[in-house]
Curated annotation (Swiss-Prot):
Zn(2+) 2 binds at residues 171, 174, 193, 196. Participates actively in the response to hyperosmotic and heat shock by preventing the aggregation of stress-denatured proteins and by disaggregating proteins, also in an autonomous, DnaK-independent fashion. Unfolded proteins bind initially to DnaJ; upon interaction with the DnaJ-bound protein, DnaK hydrolyzes its bound ATP, resulting in the formation of a stable complex. GrpE releases ADP from DnaK; ATP binding to DnaK triggers the release of the substrate protein, thus completing the reaction cycle. Transmembrane segments: none annotated. Residues 357-381 are annotated as: Disordered. This is Chaperone protein DnaJ. It comes from Cupriavidus necator (strain ATCC 17699 / DSM 428 / KCTC 22496 / NCIMB 10442 / H16 / Stanier 337) (Ralstonia eutropha).
Length: 381
């Protein structure tokens, strides 16, 4: 049967980053791991899927192997297709170029990098937790408690995975090595043991409570300290609080991804803040001092006379102190001149008189309006 494309196996594109490839592998490896799937037909399918995913990741996670695969496809990494790399390079050159792609395929000719002699340990998968906080909490820092998954040793089998009264035995197929050697022509390949799936151990009678995993899933509370100035989408890593490792491997990490709620007054742009502030017609025309809220209290700034709608004022240092830079950003106040509404007849008459007096002065009082009228006349003339 023809092998599937490695990128297709992991469900990523050919331009996927190393991090994306790693995340895809961890997700699929945990899904299809034999310890998580029952025996029988479904378990056999999961086992084949696990092997396929593992092989794809081994190729795409190594820069040299990935480059060979991208250029030549399976022929660049499959020993059964090695004839395509003959000629002046020969087998020695192929081994030198592709090093330890297959562990012990080329023995000492592959730079002396031989496969490991024991069960292969796998690092646990990382976990992600999404947290939503207010803009004020992001600006000043925050401490929160979160509930996350946790794995404890099974209290029925005390963590060894075997039903009480039975024992964990050394795998009779690989004799505890976790890997077996398979000869194909003049190649000797080292593969994961099909019986113990790389653990080196065999449990004839798995624990009825944890189903041979040795651990039970629970919940625990973690204290999370959010630094002042954290921005949207930033992540906080909690080392060792991810899923447990396999075959004695280290646990993964927990990543707390921070999201900031929309604020009724401020919009954030990096370390700067923006706000829209309505001002009266009289204040815009005559000027005055305006009071504006900030995340650290109130601030006052002068508005000059003849201020137009859309004018922006910058208040230095009234933004958010950057989590990386350590310096505060600025607050930008965008003023909008508000048109009076629901006027009385007396007020309307006063405005009409005011408007007539303004226009009697020509362009001196309304330069933009006069400029617009001149353009209109020119357009229709």
């Amino acid at each position: 049967m023809a092998k599937r494309d490695y990128y297709e196996v992991l469900g990523v594109g050919k331009n996927a980053s190393d991090d994306e490839i790693k995340k895809a592998y961890r997700k699929l490896a945990m899904k299809y791991h034999p310890d998580r799937n029952p025996e029988g037909k479904d378990g056999k399918i999961a086992e084949e899927k696990f092997k396929e995913v593992k092989e794809a990741y081994e190729m795409l996670s190594d820069p040299e192997k990935k480059a060979a695969y991208d250029q030549y496809g399976h022929a660049g990494v499959d020993p059964n297709m090695a004839g395509g790399f003959g000629g002046a390079q020969g087998y020695g050159g192929f081994a030198e170029a592709f090093g330890d792609i297959f562990g012990d395929i080329f023995g000492q000719q592959a730079g002396g990098r031989r496969g490991g002699g024991g069960p292969q340990a796998y690092r646990g998968a990382d976990l992600r937790y999404s947290m939503e906080i207010s803009l004020e909490q992001a600006a000043h820092g925050h401490e929160a408690q979160i509930r996350v998954p946790h794995w404890d040793d099974c209290d029925h089998c005390h963590g060894n995975g075997a039903e009480p009264g039975s024992s964990v035995e050394t795998c009779p197929t690989c004799h505890g090595a976790g890997q077996v050697r398979v000869s194909q022509g003049f190649f000797t390949m080292q593969q994961t043991c099909p019986k113990c799936h790389g653990s080196g151990k065999y449990i004839p009678k798995p624990c009825t409570k944890c189903h041979g995993q040795g651990k039970l899933k629970s919940q625990k509370t973690l204290e999370v300290k959010i630094p002042a100035g954290i921005d949207e989408g930033m992540r906080i890593r909690s080392s060792g609080n991810g899923e447990p490792g396999i075959n004695g491997g280290p646990p993964g990490d927990l990543y707390v991804e921070v999201h900031i709620k929309a604020h009724p007054m401020f919009e954030r742009d990096g370390d700067d803040l923006h706000c829209q502030m309505p001002i009266s017609f009289a204040t815009a025309a005559l000027g005055g001092d305006l009071e504006v809220p900030t995340l650290s209290g109130k601030a006052t700034f002068p508005v000059p006379e003849a201020t137009q709608s859309g004018k922006t004022f910058r208040l230095r240092g009234k933004g958010i102190k950057g989590v990386r830079s350590g310096y505060p950003g600025d607050l930008y106040v965008h003023v909008n001149v508000e048109t009076p509404v629901k006027l009385t007849e007396a007020q309307k008459e006063m405005l009409r008189q005011f408007d007539r007096s303004v226009h009697e002065g020509g362009s001196r009082h309304s330069p933009q309006e006069q400029s617009w009228l001149d353009k209109v006349k020119s357009f229709f003339s």
